[in-house]
């Protein structure tokens, strides 16, 4: 099933850039595509040529992946064969991966090399992938009893290890009697890390985070439950795309 040289160019030549850019495609991903083409021989890529397309993983389920854009499947579902789950955890697709899909069968053919990946060791000691190809990570905490410098250090360690830009986001400043106490604690402990204090329900929240949310940038939100991550997602999206706590 080796591809002819004319087919090698098809994935690159037929990119629907506007559709991909809507899901975070940027020049760094373009470089990863070039690296994929250079690293994979025709036999390695199987049929990933003339009848294939690129998409991004937005969810991982037991039955397969949900990807976007996926013109041939309205629900974005991509079946995944067993071979993808027989190898190491890091070889399996995760949220944020750019994948090559057979445009005719809708099957997963290959993945582009990752430029970053957030991962952790779960309570059972197994490696767990969180997200791939992330540009900036918003590490969210709040002005209340959840505030923990030690927890923030753990998140920072994960993000910096992945070579991702960290941003410390302090939420619920409108509910704190004296938010400056929390702001000062962050500044003293993490002087070299970008920090933003916001009321996630205010109109200014999106503007404060805009430098890390430009077109083509992919951000991840990390933080414990209840710190306002869903509220921030809604603020950045300009719509209620995530349900928030009462």
Spans of features found by a protein language model:
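Switch I (effector-binding) loop of TRAFAC-class P-loop GTPase G-domains
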Residues: 239-246
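Short coil/loop residues immediately preceding or within conserved phosphate-binding loops
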Residues: 52, 216, 239
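Histidine-anchored nucleotide/phosphate-binding helix
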Residues: 150-160
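Walker A/P-loop
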Residues: 230, 235
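Conserved catalytic network of the ASCE P-loop NTPase/AAA+ motor domain
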Residues: 129-132, 160-162, 214
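N-terminal accessory targeting/assembly segments
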Residues: 1-149
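Conserved beta-strand/loop subsegment of P-loop NTPase cores
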Residues: 134-141, 161-173, 191-198
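Canonical P-loop GTPase G-domain recognition
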Residues: 175-227
């Amino acid at each position: 099933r080796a591809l002819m040289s004319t087919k090698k160019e098809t994935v690159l030549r037929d990119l629907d850039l506007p559709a991909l850019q809507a899901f975070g495609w940027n020049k760094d991903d373009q470089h990863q595509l070039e690296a994929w083409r250079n690293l994979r021989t025709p036999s390695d890529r199987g049929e990933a040529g003339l009848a294939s397309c690129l998409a991004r993983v937005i969810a991982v389920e037991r039955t397969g992946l949900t990807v976007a854009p996926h013109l041939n499947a309205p629900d974005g579902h991509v079946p995944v064969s067993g071979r993808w789950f027989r190898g190491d955890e890091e070889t399996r697709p995760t949220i944020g991966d750019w994948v090559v899909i057979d445009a005719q069968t809708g099957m997963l053919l290959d993945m582009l090399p990752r430029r970053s990946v957030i991962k952790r060791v779960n309570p059972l000691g197994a490696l767990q992938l969180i997200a791939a190809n992330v540009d900036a990570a918003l590490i969210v905490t709040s002005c209340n009893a959840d505030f923990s410098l030690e927890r923030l250090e753990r998140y920072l360690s994960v993000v910096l290890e992945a070579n991702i830009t960290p941003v410390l986001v302090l939420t619920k400043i409108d509910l704190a009697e004296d938010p400056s106490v929390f702001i000062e604690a962050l500044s003293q402990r993490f002087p070299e890390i970008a920090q933003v204090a916001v009321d996630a329900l205010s109109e200014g929240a999106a503007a404060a985070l805009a430098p890390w949310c430009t077109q083509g940038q992919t951000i991840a939100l990390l933080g414990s439950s209840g710190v306002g991550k869903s509220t921030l997602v809604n603020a950045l999206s300009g719509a209620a795309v995530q349900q928030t706590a009462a």
